[in-house]
Amino acid sequence: MSIKYSNKINKIRTFALSLVFIGLFIAYLGVFFRENIIVMTTFMMVGFLAVIASTVVYFWIGMLSTKTIQIICPSCDKPTKMLGRVDACMHCNQPLTLDRDLEGKEFDEKYNKKSYKS
């Protein structure tokens, strides 16, 4: 069984999307506590804050996405954005690197850490 690689930008976008749904779910739970206004308001506010947090994450990843390096994936020939020393193609999940020292090595997220020495 092979390891499933995923693009960092897509991971962060998926996290932001999940925050939206979690926030809506939490706010919806507040409806079941209509008798107790404090509990209902608390659930609705926490859900609202989760949706606002997702907006902040979407804005942050949008700003980060404008600063990334765009490359053409050698496997699918589509343009993709790369964050860090190693990343995966957004379309075909092919492991990618721009670092000549890492070419031919097994794909590992640890290569992006500052503490890693090649």
From Swiss-Prot:
It is a multi-pass membrane protein. GO terms for cellular component: plasma membrane. InterPro entries: UPF0295 (IPR020912). Keywords: Cell membrane, Membrane, Transmembrane, Transmembrane helix. Its main location: membrane. The chain crosses the membrane at residues 12-32, 43-63. It is found in: Cell membrane. Belongs to the UPF0295 family. This is UPF0295 protein BCG9842_B4782. It comes from Bacillus cereus (strain G9842).
